[in-house]
Regions:
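NAD(P)+-binding Rossmann beta1-loop-alpha1 motif at the extreme N-terminus of oxidoreductases
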Residues: 1-45, 52, 103
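Rossmann-like NAD(P)-binding element
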Residues: 9, 30-37, 48-110, 116-117
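Internal alpha-helical scaffold of NAD(P)-dependent oxidoreductase catalytic cores
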Residues: 23, 128, 147-180, 192-221
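Rossmann-fold NAD(P)-binding glycine/threonine-rich loop
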Residues: 94-146, 151-164
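A short glycine-threonine-serine/GTX helix/turn-capping micro-motif
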Residues: 178-187, 226
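Interdomain hinge/lid region at the active-site interface
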Residues: 208, 212-247
């Protein structure tokens, strides 16, 4: 069974793909409204897949039955793998892991979906740094193929192998990163987005021109400013702060 902490955009996306891959999933969030929104989003996104003949209606209904939505952590002790997918704030994540560990069975693996924060630092607040790993899914999870895997200093080989097997069972591809600030994707992507913001600030081009230039000139599917909005400017800022402080 797979537990997911955080029912936001990343959490509901991970629940979506895990349930379709045949896993029983528990998605937890203290905000009842977030749980209900996640349920609605997952149903809507799966319905779109049905309409595009990517999955059948029977597969959708079976996947939805595999997901349990809960505003508490009562069922978390049953989980073999727990993935934290909360906001990109280290203090929030550390508190989640501190509260979570006493409720988990000893064999459970803990993963974080952080896009930038040190895996070793997050693992240090847990009772199982050897069973802790970074598992950075890309947004939107149902569409994006890549997952970055990041070992902390204490992550054991068995944990890494189990995490990689899980990711591959979802039909995803892994890229292994060392535990450096922002890992691989965001180490490259966020400075580019930041430079696009400066290009706008300095009047080099309009929003439309900058995005068009990168779509058509660099073959990017989405312009950097549009992408920043899609990621969330708060998340972009958090990652840039990690890069500023860590490099």
């Amino acid at each position: 069974m797979v537990g997911i902490i955080g029912a936001g955009q990343m959490g509901n996306g991970i629940a979506h793909v895990a349930a379709l891959a045949g896993y029983d999933v528990g998605i937890n969030d203290l905000r009842t409204e977030a749980i209900e929104k996640a349920r609605s989003i997952i149903e809507r996104n799966m319905s779109r897949q049905v309409s595009r003949s990517l999955i059948t209606d029977a597969e959708m209904q079976a996947a939805l039955r595999r997901i349990r939505f809960a505003p508490d952590l009562e069922t978390i002790g049953e989980m073999d793998l727990v993935i934290e997918a909360a906001t990109e704030d280290e203090s929030v994540k550390r508190k989640i892991f501190t509260d979570l560990c006493p409720k988990l069975k000893p064999s459970a693996i803990l993963a974080t979906n952080t896009s930038s924060i040190s895996i070793t630092r997050l693992a240090s607040v847990t009772d199982r740094p050897e069973r802790f790993i970074g598992m950075h899914f890309m947004n939107p999870v149902p569409m994006m193929q890549l997952v970055e895997l990041i070992r902390g200093i204490a992550t054991e080989d068995d944990t890494f192998v189990a995490a990689r097997s899980f990711v591959e069972s979802l039909g995803k591809v892994t890229a292994v990163s060392e535990d450096f600030p922002a890992f691989i994707v965001n180490r490259i992507l966020l400075p580019m987005i930041n430079e696009a913001v400066y290009t706008l600030y300095e009047g080099v081009g309009t929003v439309e021109s900058i995005d068009k230039a990168m779509r058509l000139g660099a073959n990017h599917p989405m312009g950097p400013l549009e992408l920043a909005d899609f990621i969330g400017l708060d998340t972009c800022l958090s990652v840039m702060q990690v890069l500023y402080e860590g490099l």
